[in-house]
């Protein structure tokens, strides 16, 4: 039986990793062993970053809603409680967008929330 040398598969595997390592500096781009470690670490950072992005945006929306609510005389928690009691089903992303791009609309929402809290 002939010996299997796996040269083609190895070349393909190396090429794939080295192409993923494009843009890296020095050995991280040129040397397969180092490039493989760099690519794996980069993929870990990318995975973690995708999770962190969701957290960061949610906290940004909360900050924006809180700022707009305080302009209208409510704290964030009281505003959200009032919105919930009104039965308004806007999520934080939508509320933050309204707060930034339509202050008059947000003021109307804040007034509704205030009226529900007073009742």
From Swiss-Prot:
Domain of life: Bacteria
Record-linked Pfam families: Ribosomal_L20 (PF00453)
Keyword Protease: no
Tagged with keyword RNA-binding: yes
GO molecular function: rRNA binding; structural constituent of ribosome
GO terms under biological process: ribosomal large subunit assembly; translation
Alphabetized SUPFAM superfamilies for the sequence: Ribosomal protein L20
InterPro entries membership: Ribosomal_bL20, RIBOSOMAL_L20_CS, Ribosomal_protein_bL20_C
Cellular component terms per the entry's GO annotation: ribonucleoprotein complex; ribosome
Spans through the membrane: none
Signal peptide as annotated in the record: none
Keyword annotations from UniProtKB, A to Z: Ribonucleoprotein, Ribosomal protein, RNA-binding, rRNA-binding
HAMAP family: Ribosomal_bL20
Function (record text): Binds directly to 23S ribosomal RNA and is necessary for the in vitro assembly process of the 50S ribosomal subunit. It is not involved in the protein synthesizing functions of that subunit.
Family: Belongs to the bacterial ribosomal protein bL20 family.
UniProt name for this protein: Large ribosomal subunit protein bL20
Protein source organism: Xylella fastidiosa (strain M12)
Gene from which this protein is expressed: rplT
